[in-house]
């Protein structure tokens, strides 16, 4: 009777897998996903050390001395906008802080004085990382204080002159963390981005999600295994760059309203 029984198909498990019953390729894909997401979160929330680049130390020192000489009376206690946030130019707590497109923060008056020091012909390089500064993001709201209004006007004038400069692919990648952080912050804030831009971001994210879950891939995972997952990450990366480009265009258009 046993001889008449049909032989049941036997599917052997991966004997050399790290976790029994789970393919090593699945484990690698999951780990890479966590690494990619963790790296993106780190880039969006990072707070780099505010160390002046050696090539800019002389210029920063001159600007610091100039600001100290112009200050006739002792400065009042400055409000602390961030934990342990010190402007690397004046070495004090940042007041009316301004963030560059490379993600470094300065006092609004300090970065404007740094720009004015010397020639005004072109965009400045960040005193910390030497990246070209094409956008200044004021991190304070409009107030009745004259100093705040002057800084907002100076930052707006700077952005009008340099925000539309051509950007290389490497520059766009380096600007990605800061632009995405500001874009998503405004997306979920009242009175932030206009609705058409929010809809475009949502549609882009939905398109990326559909591509990730779709069985139709440029490099199918069924044939190429772990290599087939790389095209999904590449599409997601291109999507983030596209969102940052759209947000830069929105910021530039605001300057001419």
UniProtKB/Swiss-Prot annotation:
Keywords: Endoplasmic reticulum, Membrane, Metal-binding, Transferase, Transmembrane, Transmembrane helix, Ubl conjugation pathway, Zinc, Zinc-finger
Residue ranges that the UniProt entry lists as topological domain Cytoplasmic: 46-200, 244-257
Alphabetized PROSITE patterns for the sequence: ZF_RING_1, ZF_RING_2
EC number: 2.3.2.27
Cellular component GO terms held in the UniProt record: endoplasmic reticulum membrane
UniProt-listed SMART domains: RING (SM00184)
Topology Lumenal: residue spans: 1-24, 222
Its membrane topology: Multi-pass membrane protein
UniProt xrefs under Pfam families: DUF1232 (PF06803), zf-RING_UBOX (PF13445)
Transmembrane segments: 25-45, 201-221, 223-243
Catalytic activities: S-ubiquitinyl-[E2 ubiquitin-conjugating enzyme]-L-cysteine + [acceptor protein]-L-lysine = [E2 ubiquitin-conjugating enzyme]-L-cysteine + N(6)-ubiquitinyl-[acceptor protein]-L-lysine
UniProt pathway: Protein modification; protein ubiquitination
Gene3D superfamilies: Zinc/RING finger domain, C3HC4 (zinc finger)
GO terms for MF: ubiquitin protein ligase activity; zinc ion binding
Record GO biological process: protein ubiquitination
Function of the molecule: E3 ubiquitin-protein ligase that plays an essential role in stimulus-induced inositol 1,4,5-trisphosphate receptor (ITPR) ubiquitination and degradation via the endoplasmic reticulum-associated degradation (ERAD) pathway. Also involved in ITPR turnover in resting cells.
UniProt protein name: E3 ubiquitin-protein ligase RNF170
Organism listed in the record: Xenopus laevis
């Amino acid at each position: 009777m046993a001889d008449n029984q049909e032989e049941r198909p036997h599917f052997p498990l991966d004997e050399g897998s790290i976790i029994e019953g789970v393919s090593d390729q699945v484990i690698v894909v999951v780990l890479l996903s966590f690494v990619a997401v963790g790296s993106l979160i780190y880039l969006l929330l990072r707070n780099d050390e505010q160390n002046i680049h050696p090539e800019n130390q002389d210029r920063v020192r001159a600007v610091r001395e100039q600001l100290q000489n112009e200050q006739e009376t002792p400065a009042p206690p400055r409000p602390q906008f961030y934990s342990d946030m010190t402007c690397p130019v004046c070495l004090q707590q940042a007041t009316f802080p301004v963030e560059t497109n490379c993600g470094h923060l300065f006092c609004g008056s300090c970065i404007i004085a740094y720009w004015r020091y010397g020639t005004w012909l072109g965009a400045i390089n960040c005193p910390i990382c030497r990246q070209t500064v094409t956008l200044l993001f004021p991190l304070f709201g409009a107030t009745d204080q004259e100093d705040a209004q002057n800084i907002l006007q100076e930052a707006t004038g700077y952005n009008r002159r340099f925000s539309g400069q051509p950007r290389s692919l490497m520059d766009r990648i380096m600007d990605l963390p800061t632009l995405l952080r500001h874009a998503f912050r405004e997306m979920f804030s009242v009175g932030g981005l206009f609705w058409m831009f929010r809809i475009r971001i949502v549609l882009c994210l939905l398109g990326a999600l559909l591509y990730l879950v779709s069985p139709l891939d440029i490099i199918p995972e069924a044939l190429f295994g772990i290599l087939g997952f790389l095209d999904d990450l590449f599409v997601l990366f291109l999507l983030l760059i596209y969102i940052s480009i759209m947000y830069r265009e929105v910021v530039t258009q605001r300057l001419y309203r």
